[in-house]
């Protein structure tokens, strides 16, 4: 069975997080047929650039598409998906608006690397670079979300108002707005638009 056929039979999964909690999925989100097919073909295409066999990649790696459509799931349930991929080599494929979040998860969990889809001149080389284990902290191309900003993003995603967040975080409402504004600058978008 080929790499592509392994993936093509699975991309009909309807529930994004249901798919994520299954340990037999290697490309999240498989319900995004274009991403799924494109990444599968790309990995086969870069076979000569990577040191590992395609079978080892299929078995040991998880490739996660951090796009604006799935971002709220990843923000609201980051503890769940991070524990679901424990023991796997996680590669985040980050769109422009999710780069700062990808960097946050890279710094704060066991992520192998980040492929910056929007900045890459040659995504094949970027992907091979990460798969081969060469991605390092020095390769981070942008700011990351801070822990405090992430807490405020999570609470905002849950529908909490700044006043409630300020009470929980034991800070002023002005501080909440400042952290939110800083996070939005790093994400190139208003938080509420990303988590709808």
From Swiss-Prot:
The keyword Transcription applies. CDD domains: LuxR_C_like. It comes from the Bacteria. Gene3D superfamilies: Winged helix-like DNA-binding domain superfamily/Winged helix DNA-binding domain (1.10.10.10). Residues 162-181 bind DNA. GO terms for cellular component: cytoplasm. Induction: Negatively regulated by H-NS. Positively autoregulated. Also positively regulated by IHF. GO terms for biological process: regulation of DNA-templated transcription. Belongs to the EcpR/MatA family. This is HTH-type transcriptional regulator EcpR. The lineage of its organism: Bacteria, Pseudomonadati, Pseudomonadota, Gammaproteobacteria, Enterobacterales.
